[in-house]
């Protein structure tokens, strides 16, 4: 182990169920960047699920970018469980809950921060028009949803 800097990148989608209609709105594409600094060693792969609990959390998704998980963190391998030492955030009301499943071996003590932002390029490629995450997440009319997106929404709206 050594004192080193680390970085991670990722991509994903966000879908929101409309509180008015109960139906799911079209998916919005996001990307993430994480930087860390500290004593750390290992390699891992992670899957992340964000649950938006409050309207305040939903409004965070409307912003161009927002931060998650800033502060010291201890990661314990090999099962990839994490212990977050940022007690202020743990003890305050949560607007967005993050769950992850991690594979690999990683150990260390590091300071890190994650930034989630709108993936404008992916939105444009998928919808063939410039569309904001806000427009997608609120279900704005006039967005041409591709067939694959319509099939996804049809399946999601069954539940």
Feature map (PLM): residue ranges:
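Small-residue-enriched, tightly packed secondary-structure blocks
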Residues: 1-159
